[in-house]
Amino acid sequence: MTIQAIIPLVIMGGAFLLIAIVAHTTGQGNLDHIKSKTVGDGQHGTARWATKKEIQQTFKHIPFRPEAWRKGKDLPTDQGLVLGCVGGGPDIGSLWVTLFKQRKKAPERPAVQALVDTDDIHCLMIGASGIGKTAFFLYSNLEYACACGMSFLALDTKGDLARNYGTIASRYYGYQVAVIDLRNPTRSDGYNLLTLINHYMDICREDSENLAARAKAEKYAKILSKTIVNPDGDASQYGQNAFFYDAAEGLLTAVILLLAEYLPPDKKTGTEQRHIVSVFKLVQDLLAPSRSAKGKNGFQVLMNKLPDTHKARWFAGAALNSADQAMMSVMSTVLSRLNAFLDSELEQVLCFDSAINAESFASRKSAIFLILPEEDPSKNF
């Protein structure tokens, strides 16, 4: 190649190098240098980056010090979500010693401050695999929640959250921890869906005048029935079949209340017999024709033995006052909804009392880790 051909290439290479140096030194093209202002008159949208002043006003800057928090020192009091951080950076002290080969006092690393949003907000984290959604974002929020004393429910598909942060929450922050493992139910803590209903019904059995306890038992029974029969919260989507689902909801509430009231734990062993599997078995048994009353099934006979003022009889009124075929359809609807809980492994979870119930979750520092296998849709009930 001749000199005449090389000179233009050298000039072009120098020009590109000069452009690269200018772009690097001026910061053009860096996301940090995108202007925090809208374009035009909003015809392309009004979204923009927040300014430093707005960030300072919107988020609370709280020193993020897990080492001190786990020793019970400098615990934060502002509850919220950790959405970012400022400070930190490389270890300046180690770099100082490496460069200058002397043990003089080096500049300290800037303290990490968490940007905490203390408002009542929801946050959606979206990112590709491996960018740190769990390790950098979720773990930071779990640590901060433990330090603040916030109760939390963590959903997991593999069990990493329970293994990594269950022990930390219990050992260092004094949390009551429950792990509901639907991937390995035999290793899971218990989760009896009727725990609160049984608790308040036991109080009623000891003090029949305690109206508040009975009202709470009925409230939690209605909530459970609504969750099982109409998980979407509205039966109108079923069209002409809405009656059967509404009646099934009332019938299930009645059976749950009867079970909680008249089937106390075994006095000798203390074994709890009131759980969702017992509800299924009772409905199935009551579906059979009665031997004592011709033309009636077991459920109708049982309801006739209750006083007229008993709430269980009221809840089941829609089913009791319908035609025999319609009532059979209502009871079959209840059984079909309870089919999801029939599993020998799941019974190890559902037939034992809960380590944490809804009320203790709200009143004490609690952490519930729910492990849901995404490859097994039968566990999504």
Question: Each predicted region: which residue ranges?
Answer:
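Basic- and hydrophobic-enriched, low-structure N-terminal and domain-boundary segments
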Residues: M1-I131, A135-E143, C148, T186, ...
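P-loop NTPase motor domains
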Residues: G88, F100-P110, A114-F381
